[in-house]
Amino acid sequence: MLTSLITSSTTVTLTLSQIYYILDIACGFLISVLVWMNSSVLDNGNHSNPQIRDMSSNMIKADCVVIEDSFRGFPTEYFCTSPRYDECLDYVLIPNGMIKDRLEKMSMDIVDYYEACNATSITLMCVLKGGFKFLADLVDGLERTVRARGIVLPMSVEFVRVKSYVNDVSIHEPILTGLGDPSEYKDKNVLVVEDIIDTGKTITKLISHLDSLSTKSVKVASLLVKRTSPRNDYRPDVGFEVPNRFVVGYALDYNDNFRDLHHICVINEVGQKKFSVPCTSKPV
């Protein structure tokens, strides 16, 4: 079915999927404003611009959306979630439309960085399983940015699998598998695509390993970074800084559940108990 929008001089025809996409972006913008108003992201007189974070050697310069500890999210009944997770979620922390809007800007920042470095190609390394949705949407944004600018920046994708949690407990030593032939990374610009950085142990281990493979550069783009105590000092290019709560959805999981949620949500005690498994790994 097609819907026509009539202007004074022309007729613009959009498919329903295009209309839904426009509405999704508009909703994301409105929700972004609500988050800003509720969480006091902007300078409140107590900090000097908390959105701008110091850059480490493995960081691509980008602003960070900070969701404060005082922000209590959005009621789940206002969003589409699976009946399987009824009573398992505390609230929606980041709606999907807001995620998509943030990734558009991250994509432009990343292309800016590699253009400035005169990079001839990028190898994106997705950290599975939680990073696959972030990767798909990020690559889509990168490709749109490259096309719009009329530049040549070939991209390839590799995958590495990491296990770092059992239930809500970070295990003592993250397990990395699937890196493949080490020679494939020699003299490559590697962009690690991670879903969330918590303690920083997993990403630090992965960067150290990649550095040993004679890569040209190793950078990290993470959808989320969690405010932990003691504070995790590793600062990648990041979409959102979030409170130290266990988050699920948008491919982030709790024992391989909740990956199918459209939004990023905070799991509650009922959900943790319902989907818990016996813990055999040594905690941190």
Curated annotation (Swiss-Prot):
Keyword tRNA-binding in record: no
Cofactor field: Mg(2+)
Gene Ontology biological-process annotations: GMP salvage; guanine salvage; hypoxanthine metabolic process; IMP salvage; purine ribonucleoside salvage
EC numbers, comma separated: 2.4.2.8
Pfam families: Pribosyltran
First-level EC class: transferase
Record's catalysed reaction(s): IMP + diphosphate = hypoxanthine + 5-phospho-alpha-D-ribose 1-diphosphate; GMP + diphosphate = guanine + 5-phospho-alpha-D-ribose 1-diphosphate
Subcellular location: Cytoplasm
Binding site for GMP: K129, E194, D195, I196, I197, D198, T199, G200, K201, T202, K226, D253
Taxonomic superkingdom: Eukaryota
Cofactor binding note of this UniProt entry: Binds 2 magnesium ions per subunit. The magnesium ions are essentially bound to the substrate and have few direct interactions with the protein.
Active-site residue numbers: D198 (proton acceptor)
Family assignment from sequence similarity: Belongs to the purine/pyrimidine phosphoribosyltransferase family.
PANTHER family for the chain: HYPOXANTHINE PHOSPHORIBOSYLTRANSFERASE, HYPOXANTHINE-GUANINE PHOSPHORIBOSYLTRANSFERASE
Identification of the protein by name: Hypoxanthine-guanine phosphoribosyltransferase
Organism: Schistosoma mansoni
